[in-house]
Amino acid sequence: MKRHLVAVDIGGSKTAFLARTVGSDRKASVERYKTPASGGVGAMLALLDEHIDGLAGGRSSLAALGVAVPGHVDPNGHVVCAGNLEGWVDVPLREQLEERYRVPVFVEGDANCGALGEKWLGAAKEMNDFVFLALGTGVGAGVFVNGSLHRGAHSAAGEVGDMTFPRRKRNGAAPTLASIVGKRALKKVVRRETGKKLTAAEALHRAAKDRRLERLTREFIEYLSTSVVAISSLLDPEAILFGGGTSKAGEALLKRVRETVAPNHVVRARLMLAGLGSEAQLYGALWGAQNALASSQALDAVEQLPQAAP
């Protein structure tokens, strides 16, 4: 029976699944489902069950699982918090999944997964210092320094969505980067002002030829560009890779960010689209599942070695 590696990218609005046969390097198809709006972790586990049970060979064919979570995850796969998911606070997710499926499990923050995916199969294969900027329902960054994923002292490196801008207070509170650059925020502004139901990526793409949309997306570009300058001045990366659903705006997005940051000479990094596009996080989770399986097999091999004589 063929055994499968399953990767899951949990987003604030959509959850993507990818299954690949162990040992294969063939590109697998991606399936997307609506992320449960309520029910917390239990609702997501039910969605996982449904997908995994639908594999050829069913649950018994699952070899390892990799999961990208939109939030703060510690090195042990414990979800500290995931702000865009109801009830996801202090969740021992890796432990729960290992008990549920009895296979090796990898759990990581989605931005970190994006960086891992790009380093493995994407635009950063030859880079040692780069930042993957995940633009979706929220905003996060996966950081590579000297060829390794940088987590920080509290495993919270890259939580750029929490950056605040005190000089632009709204209703007495300083807005965060995520509150402006998150795709729901831009979608809401566009719909309120134009009546059009456009995704953030669509609005940014059309803004190149639509003055009204250009004006409505200007604040988005300004805030995003400010974060690019901050990241560049702090880390001096070789490149900043734009991924996540909003990156589907493509060169229309990059062109405006480049033009906005151009006067600031601290930005030496190349501003690029992620090589794997909006699937970078999914492939990072797949890398994690593959690595978890290999580590488990190596441990099993060691445990099966004959014991040395006393």
Q: Residue spans of the language-model regions?
A:
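General beta-strand structural signal in soluble alpha/beta enzymes
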Residues: 105-109
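Conserved A3 ("GATE") glycine/threonine-rich loop of ANL adenylate-forming enzymes
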Residues: 13-14, 111, 137-140
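A short alpha->loop->secondary-structure connector
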Residues: 152-153
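ATP-binding/phosphotransfer module of carbohydrate and carboxylate kinases, centering on a glycine-rich
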Residues: 1-64, 74-76, 95-103, 117-127, ...
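Structural signature of FAD isoalloxazine-binding scaffolds in flavoprotein oxidoreductases
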Residues: 156-160
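Short beta-strand segments
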Residues: 9, 66-70, 132-138, 142-144
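A charged helix-plus-loop insertion that forms the helical arch/lid used to bind
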Residues: 79-89
